[in-house]
Amino acid sequence: MEVDGAEPARRRSTRATRGRHSKYEEAVEEPGKVKSDKKDPKTSDKNPKTTKLKTPTKAKTTTRSKARKKSKNDEEGVVRCPCGATEDDPSDGKIMIECEDCLEWQHSQCVLQTNDLEQVPDHYVCNECTEKKTQEKETTEAQEESEDKGKGEEEKDSNDKDEKYDSTYVPNNETAEKEPVARVSKSTHKRVGHIDDITEKVRKSAASALKGIFVSVPTSKYSPGAGVSPEQFCETLALTIEQELYDAYGTVEPEIGSNYRDKFRTLSFNLRDSKNETLRIRVMTGQVTPQTLVAMSSEEMMNPELQKLAEEVRAEAIRDTVLVVDEAPRLRRTHKGEEIVGEYEEYIDNVDQALKMERQRDGDGKEAAESRNQIERAVRDIEGANGEADSKTSNSPKESSNSPIVPKWKRDIDLAQGESDHEHDHDHNSDHEDKVNGILGDVSREAREAETDDWTTISEAPFVWTGTVPMAGLDKTSCAAFSLGSSSVHFNPNVSWGSVFYASKPLTIEGRLDKSKADPYLSKVLGAGTRDVAAFCLLPSDSSESDREAYYKLYEYFHSRSKYGVIHNRSTLVKDAYLIPLAPDDAPPYTLGSLVKPSVELSSLKRSRPLLVALYIVGKLSPKRGAAVSVESHVASSEKHPPKRQSMRDRVKQNAGNAGNASRRASDARKSTPPVTATPVTPAAPTLVAPVNAPVGPAPVVPPYAGFQGGVYGAPVGIQRVPGAPMGVPGVPIAPAGMPGVPVAPLGMHGAPAHHMAQSGTPIAPAAHPRKPTGAPPPDLDALKTLLNDPNLRNAPAAPAQNDLLQNPALLMSIIDQAKKR
C-alpha cells in the first residue's frame, strides 16, 4: 500500500540475491556457482531485528532462508502466500520468510503458525518445492530400476533428466552441514568412451595421467586382447579406474572434492614408482581390478622394498612396547643396605646349568678355565651375600659385605668381630654351600681370609688421627690414620704427629700435583738429607656405605689421573704434604721405603684393595722435637699383657676417654700439693741437705742454656736445673725471685750454686747458707709415681722442650725412692 501524498520509498532486503530478480536469471546458470554477496553493514545496523541469520561453515553455497518484517519500502521479490497475498503490507506487522529454492516470500504465520522471529528456522523450503523434490526422487528410483533391466532408451532419458536435475538442484544449508561430501552413484553420471568426452577438468586430467602411466608399460608384460590396440586398452582401463575413483570419493560439486584428489595422488605415486612394476602389471593383467585398486590402502600399494621396511618398523615398535624380564635377582636398596628380591634358589639353578654347559663346550682349555673362574666368582659373591641373611631369617635376605654389587674393598674395619660373625654365618649357610661347593669347591673361605690380612695388619697398628678429608667437588670422606713411620730415628708415632699437623682440623685437599713431577721432587728432598719424611695410612673410619663410597671416589679421582693430592692441614714445621693413592698392585714409592721402624710395612702387605697414604716432608727432627716420653715399666707391662683387638670406633672412644682422665688426674695432683713459702737463709758452710723437699729462698736467675720451665704433662710447675750443677742432675723447682708463696713441685732439691757434688748425686749447699725446714708436710710421692706410670700421661703430646730428667725415667724413679726412705 502507498500513502497518499507521500513519495513511495524503496524496499529494503537482506537476501543474498539483493538487487536481482529471479525472473531475470538465466536458466543455464548453475545456482551452486553463485556466491553470496556481503551484506551491507549499514543495512544490518538499521534493521537488526528483522533477520535471523546463521552462517554455515562447510557449505559452498550461501543461500538461506530470510525472515523479515514487512516494510513500506519492500518492492522486490515475489510474494506468494497460502492466504492469497501477492504484495507485502508492512502495516500488518507480520514476519515474512523466503523459500531457499524458489525464492518466493510467504507469511511466517501462514506456513509455520508463528510470528516469533526466534522460532523461524534457519533453512526454509516451501510446500511446492518439497513436493517437487519428492517427485524427482521417485523418478530417479524408477530410472535406476530401468537401468538394471538394460533398457538403453530409458537409460538415456534417465541421464537427460539427471543432467537437468544437476543443473537446477541446489542443496540447502542444512543438508550441506550434515553431509559436506555427497556421494555419487553409478547411475547419476553418464559413462563415456573417450577421455575427451569428460567435461569436468579435474576428472579429465586424472584419466589422462592414468593413461600415460599404463602406456609406458611394455606390451610384452600384458595382453590387450584381440582387435584392441594397446593405446585403446590403456585408455579404457584409465577411464574405468577414474570412474571407480569418482564413484568412491567424488562429490556432486564441480570441484570434485579433496578426498578424490588425495586418493588420486596416492594412486598416481604408487603406479609411477619405478620399483613398483609389480603393481602395474597386476592391474593391467586383471589380477587387481579397478574397484580393488581404489579400495587398497597406501601401504598395500607400496613397492616390496617399502613394505619390508614398514614391517620392520612395526616389529621394532612392538618390541619397544614389550618389557624385558630380567632373570637375575634384583636388588632393593634400603636404609639397611642392599637386599636380594626374587627367587634366589631358582637363580642358583640357572647359574649351575650355565656352568655345566660352559664346561661341556669349552673343555679344560685356558679360555674355559678363565670363563669358569668368572662364573665361580659371581656365584661365590652371591652366595656370600646371602650367608649372613640366611643366618638371621630364611625369608628376607639381608645385606652382606660380599654382595656382588658392593666392591671387595667395602668392608668394615672391625675385622676381629667381623671374622667371628662370618664364621658363625658360614655354619648356618651350609645348605647353600653344599649345593654350590660340589662344582665350585670351598674357595670362598680362603678368599675371605686373604682379604682380611691387610686390614687386620693395618687396623692393629696405633692410629694417630680420625676425621674427615674434604675436597671441592667430592663428598667428605671420614677416615682414620695409622702411622707408617718416619725417616728419622727421633720420630715417635705416639706423640710426634702433634707437631706435624693439627689433629683437631680436617685434612683438606687444596690441590693436586702430577705424579711424574712429585716423585722426582720427593726423591731429591730425601736424598739431600736436610729434611725428614713422615707418613700415615688413611682408611675409612665408618662401616656405612656412604663413607666407603666417598673413600673410593677420592682414591679413584687421583689414581685415574696419575696425580697426588696436596694437603692443606700442616704445621709450620712441615714444608709439603701430599696424599698418595696406592693401587693393590702398585709398588710403594721409593720415599716410603726409607721409613724407620714403621708400624706397618707396605712392602709386606698383600693388598687386595686401594689405599690412601698421607706423606709429610718435615724439617730435620732432633731428639727434643721427635722424642717421646716412655716409661720402661709400662712397656714391660704392655709386652706381658698385650691389649685385645679392638675396632677403630671403640679405640677412638677409648682414647678420648683416656685423654680426659689424664687431664683430671693432673688437676687432682695440683690440688693435693700443699702450699709452701720461701724463707731467706743466711750464708753458712756447705752442709748436706736432709729433706729433699725443703723450701728455699729466692734462686738466682737461670740462664736459658741451663734448663727450662716445663712440666711433666700436667704437673703444677716445671723442673729447674741448679746453676752450675753437672748435666743430668736435677734441681729443685723453685719460684721466681720476689714471688714467695708459689707452690713448688713435690720433687727434687734446691741449694745455692754448688762447687762440688757428692757421689750419691745429692747437691751440697755452701756452708754459709744452711737450710731450714719450713715444717710443710711432704707431698704424696706415691701418687706422683702412679701419675708418672700412667700410660695416657706418657702418650700425651710432648712439650716444646724437655728436661734431661724426663729422658731418664730410671733416675727419676730412684730419686723418688730415696726421698720416700728419708
Curated annotation (Swiss-Prot):
One of its GO terms (biological process) is DNA-templated transcription. GO terms for molecular function: zinc ion binding. PROSITE patterns: TFIIS_CENTRAL, ZF_PHD_1. InterPro entries: SPOC_C, TFIIS_cen_dom, TFIIS_cen_dom_sf, Zinc_finger_PHD-type_CS, Znf_FYVE_PHD, Znf_RING/FYVE/PHD. SMART domains: TFS2M. Residues 11-21, 49-71 have a biased composition (Basic residues). The keyword Transcription regulation applies. It is found in: Nucleus. Residues 198-323 form the TFIIS central domain. Negative regulator of transcription elongation. This is Transcription factor BYE1.
